[in-house]
Amino acid sequence: MGPRGRGGSRGGSFRGGGSRGRGRGRGRGGVNRFGKRPRFDSARVEDKEKESEEESLSEAEEDSEVPESESSDESVAEEAPTRPYMALLRSLSKGSGIKRRKLDHEPNNSEESGEDDSSESSADEDAPDDVCGDVDLVDEPEEDHDEIMEQERSDDEDEKDLTDSFNSHFASPDEVEVAERIKSITNHEWVSKRLPSKSARTVLTLPKQKDASDNASGPVPVTNPATLILKPKLKESITSQRPQLDASEQALAAPLFQYYDTLYCQRTVANGHNLRRLVCLHALNHIFKTRDRVIKNSAKLAKESADPDLEFRDQGFTRPKVLMLLPTRNSCAKMIEMMCSLTETDQQENRKRFDDSYVTREKQKFSNDKPTDFRDLFEGNADDMFRLGVKFTRKTIKFFSQFYNSDILLASPLGLRMAMGSTEEKNLDHDFLSSIEIVIMDQADAILMQNWEHVEHIFEHLNRQPKEAHGADFSRIRSWYLDGQSKNYRQTVILSSFNNPDLSEVMRVHCHNWQGKIRIQPDYQGVIQQLGVKVKQTFSRFDAQTIIADPDARFEYFIKAVVPSLTKRVKDSCGTLVFIPSYMDFVRVRNWFATSPAAQSLSFGVISEHTEVSETSRARSHFVTGRQKVLLYTERCHHFWRHQLRGVRRVIFYGLPDNPVFYKEIAGGCLGRSEQDMTLEPGEGSVRAMFSKYDVMKLERVVGTPRVGKMLHEKGDTFDFV
């Protein structure tokens, strides 16, 4: 059956969601389209006394939490190539008028959203939480650009500042330099350089330039918010809230406010709040400057209407300018709260509806053994299917605005992909992503545990030329939009607790910012000395010729070099936990244990993100009592549940986890728990980890930066640590 997660008071939240190749599931009130997942009877159990089994079963169930919702995914077909832009202009020349446009699959006739910026509509207050099974449903007409600007006015009269990164990057860039850089980007010509930094490894990557100096210094350092060029209202707010920036904020602020693509790999629970404040400040500043520039230029055009040569290029195809990709509704609520605190806006339209849909006021019921990062991620409403449009006017914030009327789009990857529709349903729509100028992905390490395919799909559809006009005034659209170069001006900011090949690939394939890219990540001390118990740790390197051949080489090494040590002394194999990061590898190993004659002497059980709670409790019980000597356990299951496994005497890492905290929890936590239960003598536990040269990022975080080079290049392939 589909992936499961917590429900109940979390507002239908669900976690997990299959392997990287499968999607996450439905939202509140949804249904499983595909029915139950076929069961694979994979366990092999040895006979034991029933009494001991029941006793251990009750112990295992104490740590289980029953999910109340299940999820499945809709696969979305790829879009056909877009038509040439000149054909688009011809098709739009007839005029489109005002359209009623929805980004949902079902109509909602019971709710209408008003445009009064000072109050909530009665329809919004009276609408049920689960209208048509979709709490994020919006049904309102798409506004024309001119109509939008007639309702608003600039909040100050600041003039153009040539030192302002907003002007130098978007409004008035050096066209010759930008053209040269874009040409280099098109030819995949980049130059990388490591910048001096005390707290992190900072790598600057710039498009190659003929006359560029090798002494590129990177972004100008930012020590406090007072040095930033911000809208006055935002500057007053941030200087009162945060007059000085700490080291982590300074590292991010410099590339962030100077519009570099940024991969920041030092996000923690401790600094997450401050980093969230910075990205919200940057997003709001960008939106307000864009809005005020358009309003001022519109006023000038109205005043000088007799001048036919007067022209202002200050808009995109559509209104949304910022996209925030977030893992859960609760993380979205934290972003919204931060924006409200920075804007200090009292008038918030549809606020009650937002609180009802995104904020869980009931006290969380986490067991005492859940770690801090788990609580931070899954507290509140942990539903991972949502999308929200937010519109800002001079005095009002409107939640649940229609996407084409919004300034900021906040969504989970699954929620946004569902909003984009599919070619199968003939409702594919991604025009609202055509003019995104800033993408912010927060808690990317958590999004990696969802369906990364959705993230790739979204990035592939960013900054494409739209299929419809959406009321745009083409005489006001910036030239680089019309030339199909908007992706070269878009800034992408990714915040994660660690780097990962998928994150690096997004930066390599989808980030074409002419300003350049910056990667910030720390040097690691490693966690092998932080287990809290004395245990022998053996790291075994195997050879894989290519990254494509790595899964096969890993499997062959496992069954030929690791499993024989278990089958030769079956009695000593009791309490063996096999940790498998990839679900595809998990299926392969599970099937081999179930069908291979070489494994017939080994009883085994399985726990994955797809395993039902009753089966999980049974597997844990059999493992504790010894009826199942080997337990196969996946990384994503541990991410979503953090099971406190008992009876572990030996840990085998089929692959190292992305998150180094998991290594410490599995190796140190499980073996330490066995010593506390006096089922394992101190110092008798063991850990064996398999790795190849393609695991360099994972290995560095586990063993430490100083050791990783030697372990990858030395002649020996076995490394022991005590």
Curated annotation (Swiss-Prot):
InterPro entries in alphabetical order: P-loop_NTPase, UTP25, UTP25_C, UTP25_NTPase-like
Chain intervals with Gly residues compositional bias: 1-20
Acidic residues bias locations: 52-77, 112-161
Pfam families: Utp25_C, UTP25_NTPase-like
Main location: nucleus
Alphabetical GO biological process terms: maturation of SSU-rRNA from tricistronic rRNA transcript (SSU-rRNA, 5.8S rRNA, LSU-rRNA)
GO molecular function: rRNA binding; U3 snoRNA binding
Function description: DEAD-box RNA helicase-like protein required for pre-18S rRNA processing, specifically at sites A0, A1, and A2.
Protein name stated in the entry: U3 small nucleolar RNA-associated protein 25
Upper taxonomic lineage: Eukaryota, Fungi, Dikarya, Ascomycota, Pezizomycotina
Gene transcribed to yield this protein: UTP25
